[in-house]
Amino acid sequence: MVKKLGLNFKNTKTSVSELKQRIVFLIVAIIVFRIGSFIPIPGIDTTILSKILNNQNGTIVDMFNMFSGGALSRASIFALGIMPYISASIIIQLLTLVYPTLSEIKKEGESGRHRINQYTRYATLILALVQSIGIAMTLPNIAGIRSIIINTDFYFYLIAIISLVTSTMFLMWLGELITEYGIGNGISIIIFIGIIAGLPSAIGNTIEKTRQGDLHILLFLFILLLIFSVIFLVVFMERGQRKIVVHYAQRQQGRRIYETPSTHLPLKINMAGVIPAIFASSIVLFPATIISWCKVNHEWLTKILFYLQPNQFLYLILYISAIVFFCFFYTGLVFNPRETADNLKKSGAFISGIRPGEQTAKYINKIMLRLTLVGSLYITFICLIPEFMRSAMNVPFYFGGTSLLIVVVVIIDFITQIQTLIMSNQYESMLKKANLN
């Protein structure tokens, strides 16, 4: 009895200790990331650059600056953030559909996953190099102001490119360490921290505006109610699933026939996650950003720039269309109904009233199309709420729809990871107790 109590106490202590270690590691990693976001690239007058980039509201620069926790506006070594890694991951996923060799590697299990990760790292290095060269070459010519660069010689470009590339690779490595030794997905955590870095000052500014009477108290309360409602909707939709009941063939042992219990195939409503919102924002904002950087006095370019500004009708149409397109595109990329149907058939599973194989694939695909349509409408709604708040009601809204989605999804994943860690430790404890008996 005493031995059992001692083992139970030891297992509980080990579980709490492991959770503490992971949380401490996560906090240290976050501190390292935030410190790095304040280290400037050598040779840049960050004060002038910050003033210039503050005028880039509603452009792709503004979005990347938020994802990097303000590192871009400070010309920090972390200015590229983790975006090259995200782009590289999506490119590699696309290539697995085009090249059969990569598709076969992906199916090799743990070894295949390791090789795909290596290819993703190489692609990240290439993208980071290209983007860092672009930033280094663009910085001296932003808005035609050359005074932000103290000395525009060869060594400035070399140091800037090396600083940006190595910092991006460091962030990728830090994200992988967080995934392994911390809690949650490391890359998502880094993006999450970057987004919420400016949240305290935004809350303070909103409260100050309310206190001074610039923002009506009822409007302030409405904003709070809206935020909580949106968070509730995001949690509900992200946790929502369509469960398809799956049966297994009867198992015969000797003369007896055993009925195998049925299970279900869970299909998420929003299978694409936040990727469609990120890609849609990037693509729609990119042309306007490039035009605003180029000092070209063509009337037709000025008109294009005007119509591609946030809250303009053309911008909203393109934005909504891009979100819906990428929802269907990315869902088709990460989920293959035919492959799922083949796996069910191989394991002896079937859906009641549906023939295994081709008919099952068509049935699953039909359900996925409906779920993706609902998911795309949900993401579009979330992404348009901040636009409506800013334009129609002239309300300061710190989060964009993309950022709000990322924040809530990462928090959900973080809580799930903690619950999983606690449950796995409790399960191990139960197994040890059973072996002791």
From Swiss-Prot:
Domain of life: Bacteria
Family annotation (PROSITE patterns): SECY_1, SECY_2
Pfam families: SecY
SUPFAM superfamilies the UniProt entry points to: Preprotein translocase SecY subunit
Main location: membrane
Residue intervals passing through the bilayer: 23-43, 77-97, 125-145, 154-174, 183-203, 217-237, 271-291, 315-335, 367-387, 395-415
Localization: Cell membrane
GO cellular component, one term: plasma membrane
InterPro entries for this protein: SecY, SecY/SEC61-alpha, SecY_CS, SecY_dom_sf
Database matches in HAMAP family: SecY (MF_01465)
Name of the protein described by the UniProt record: Protein translocase subunit SecY
Species this protein is from: Buchnera aphidicola subsp. Acyrthosiphon pisum (strain APS) (Acyrthosiphon pisum symbiotic bacterium)
Lineage of origin: Bacteria, Pseudomonadati, Pseudomonadota, Gammaproteobacteria, Enterobacterales
